[in-house]
Amino acid sequence: MATQRMLQFVTKSKEMPVKRDADDRRDDFDEIYREFAEEKAVEQASRCSQCGVPYCQSHCPLHNNIPDWLMLTAAGRLQEAYELSQATNTFPEICGRICPQDRLCEGNCVIEKSGHGTVTIGAVEKYITDTAWDKGWVLPVVPMQERTESVGIIGAGPGGLAAADVLRRQGVQVTIYDRYDRAGGLLTYGIPGFKLEKDVVMRRNDQLAEGGVKFELNCNVGVDISFADIRAKHDAVIIATG
């Protein structure tokens, strides 16, 4: 039954979220594209051809389970779609906004190659995760069992934050050190708001903190604290400085 909702690319055209009018955009740095409405996200997800060999997944650096969460979205099972996207990606709503889908998943979509227009994978990924935040489905990490091992992470950019998320899910005690006053690295300081609004990054930082990740900000390693001191405090150290 679920597959009958799919393969709709022959009757439904590719559509992107509505772009905000230029007259509105020139007065702010808010994101350029509006959110999909639910019915439009369902429609666009249903265009997936459910390939036996999903090139979208194999060309994704994270190997996200794209066909399955598209199928769940098409079926209206958005919470399950979010949980599946989160299983392989710490920041699905951020990747949905800034990942170069045209060169990766969408650029290798089979129906794009056949002239039907790619599935709008990034826009759907953004939609299901933003919906998860709105519905309260995104919760702080609660490990099944706390462990005594401690890991220090130098750098609060996307690599450091993703490592912290994975380690906390395993119950490891994590402290992140960063010289800036806010976590996020390039996500916070390098990407303009019209591509990635900063509250999207901050809510992920807050989620990690609520899940037990400790942040030592305004802490310049080598100036405010030595590497030797960090090494002495932890069982292992990850250097994630970009």
What are the functions of these language-model segments?
Residues 178, 215-217, 239-241:
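General beta-strand structural signal in soluble alpha/beta enzymes
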Residues 82-89, 124, 187-236:
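N-terminal Rossmann-like dinucleotide/flavin-binding domain of flavoprotein oxidoreductases
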Residues 1-150, 198, 237-242:
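Ferredoxin-type iron-sulfur electron-transfer modules and their immediate structural context
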Residues 172-188:
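Glycine-rich FAD pyrophosphate-binding loop
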Residues 90, 157-158, 182:
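Residue-level detector of alpha-helix initiation sites
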Residues 173-175, 235-238:
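Beta-sheet entry/capping signal
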Residues 150-175:
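N-terminal Rossmann-like FAD-binding beta1-loop-alpha1 element of flavoenzymes
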